[in-house]
Swiss-Prot record:
Assembly and oligomerization: Homodimer.
Source species of the chain: Citrobacter koseri (strain ATCC BAA-895 / CDC 4225-83 / SGSC4696)
Protein name: Dihydroorotase
Pfam families associated with the record: Amidohydro_1
Transmembrane helix is among the record's keywords: no
Cofactor: Zn(2+)
Keywords assigned: Hydrolase, Metal-binding, Pyrimidine biosynthesis, Zinc
Binding-site list for Zn(2+) 2: 103, 140, 178
């Protein structure tokens, strides 16, 4: 006789960092997020990027059109900051409830970021307006200078960009997104109530050895890149401590299989189908399941000043096999942990 499965019931979570793409890709991936999460902060790095209120409204509608009947899901839209963005347009979007936050991509830091900001000084009028409005700034925290080693770009960003910015605009709300280093974990932990962080499942579960030892695993390649074990452990310890300003942000970033498994593959993990169970596995390994619901469902709304979701989801602890691939128009998607057996999954 098998032992009864363990069930975890938590308030419905939100995903505070997701890429839903557009077109056929959007139609394929949206249901994996809308089935589980009540809300999601949607990244604006389309081609062209979402820089106007009208573009955000149109994109939001395309997302909603892809949500299956029976899913109760609200996309929270963001504005892509550029060197030439009009502060009045940003303010209008925020006041009208179209923009929840604005996203700072250093130019060329990641996928579709060539329109990103070349220097924080260039967009200071926009950031000052955001500070005045109480509008959160979401930051991809990496410098992009060619002479900086890719494994050092996050730590260098803290000292050269993030800290000077927060010293200059002391009332600005900042989310340090997808943190990957001990440096960032300590920086956010020691910061004030205006600084928070999202953490992905892959950066909690894996380090660069998993991606590079015994063969290159392209489906673990994302930006910021996986770091040393010491950094992975610092992230795990931060979430296991019950720290209240760290919350779930999958950074689910789908690319067609042929764009990942190639001589110059794209960065991003499509983890929407498996992320919640992956987080549960980490919290269980750290003997921290008591803090799991807060990380997934409570800390994010608190930081954003939003109410928590009224419904609940259940995860079951029984081994399940993750599909090796998901059909995508004339290609396929490989989900995070595809072809592997996982311990926790959404019931």
């Amino acid at each position: 006789m098998t032992a009864p499965s363990q069930v975890l019931k938590i308030r419905r979570p939100d995903d505070w960092h997701v890429h839903l793409r557009d077109g056929d890709m959007l139609k394929t991936v949206v249901p994996y997020t809308s089935e589980i999460y009540g809300r999601a902060i949607v990244m604006p790095n389309l081609a062209p990027p979402v820089t106007t209120v009208d573009a955000a409204i149109a994109y939001r509608q395309r997302i909603l059109d892809a949500v299956p009947a029976g899913h109760d899901f609200t996309p929270l839209m963001t504005c892509y900051l550029t060197d030439t963005l009009d502060p009045d347009e940003l303010e209008r979007g925020f006041r009208e409830g179209v923009f929840t936050a604005a996203k700072l991509y250093p130019a060329n830091a990641t996928t579709n970021s060539s329109h990103g900001v070349t220097s924080v000084d260039t967009i200071m009028p926009v950031l000052e307006r955001m500070e005045k409005l109480g509008m959160p700034l979401l930051v991809h925290g990496e410098v992009t200078h060619a002479d900086i080693d890719i494994f050092d770009r996050e730590a260098r960003f803290i000292e050269t960009v993030m800290e000077p910015l927060r010293q200059r605009l002391t009332a600005l709300k900042v989310v340090f997104e997808h943190i990957t280093t001990k440096d960032a974990a300590e920086y956010v932990r020691d910061g004030n109530e205006l600084l928070a962080a999202t953490i992905t499942p892959q950066h909690l579960m894996f380090n660069r050895n998993h991606m590079l030892v015994g063969g290159i695993r392209p489906h673990l390649y994302c930006l910021p890149i996986l770091k040393r074990n010491v950094h992975q452990q610092a992230l795990r310890e931060l979430v296991a401590s019950g720290f209240s300003r760290a919350f779930l942000g999958t950074d689910s970033a789908p690319h067609a299989r042929h764009r990942k498994e190639t001589s110059c593959g794209c960065a991003g993990c499509f983890n929407a189908p498996t992320a919640l169970g992956s987080y549960a596995t980490v919290f269980e390994e750290m003997n921290a399941l008591a803090h799991f619901e807060a990380f997934c469902s409570l800390n994010g709304p608190r930081f954003y000043g939003l109410s928590v979701n009224e419904t609940y989801v259940e995860l079951v602890r029984e081994e399940q096999l993750v599909p090796e691939s998901i059909t995508l128009a004339d290609d396929s998607l490989v989900p995070f942990l595809g072809g592997e057996r996982v311990r926790w999954s959404v019931k």
